[in-house]
Swiss-Prot record:
GO terms for cellular component: proton-transporting two-sector ATPase complex, catalytic domain. It catalyses: ATP + H2O + 4 H(+)(in) = ADP + phosphate + 5 H(+)(out). It comes from Sulfurisphaera tokodaii (strain DSM 16993 / JCM 10545 / NBRC 100140 / 7) (Sulfolobus tokodaii). The keyword Transport applies. Keywords: ATP-binding, Hydrogen ion transport, Ion transport, Nucleotide-binding, Translocase, Transport. To E.hirae NtpH. One of its GO terms (molecular function) is ATPase-coupled transmembrane transporter activity. InterPro entries: ATPase_A1-cplx_e-su (IPR012508). This is Membrane-associated ATPase epsilon chain. The lineage of its organism: Archaea, Thermoproteota, Thermoprotei, Sulfolobales, Sulfolobaceae. GO terms for biological process: proton motive force-driven ATP synthesis; proton transmembrane transport.
Length: 59
């Protein structure tokens, strides 16, 4: 393999790696947003449950 071929191949490999890293970061960001949304929903549910329990205890 000539040096030109190798450098061309390396160039395309680096381009592909960059695109894969970008896609990975996008997916991780979406996963993180969904995770935080789910955690907030759970926290809200627990706070509501806590409020209901406190009302029952105070009766």
């Amino acid at each position: 393999m000539s040096e030109i071929d190798k450098s061309t191949i390396d160039k395309y490999i680096n381009i592909l790696k960059s695109k894969l890293d970008q896609k990975k970061n996008e997916l991780l960001s979406k996963i993180n947003m969904e995770y935080e949304k789910t955690l907030k929903q759970r926290l809200d549910e627990l706070e509501k449950l806590k409020g209901n329990i406190l009302k029952e205890v105070q009766k």
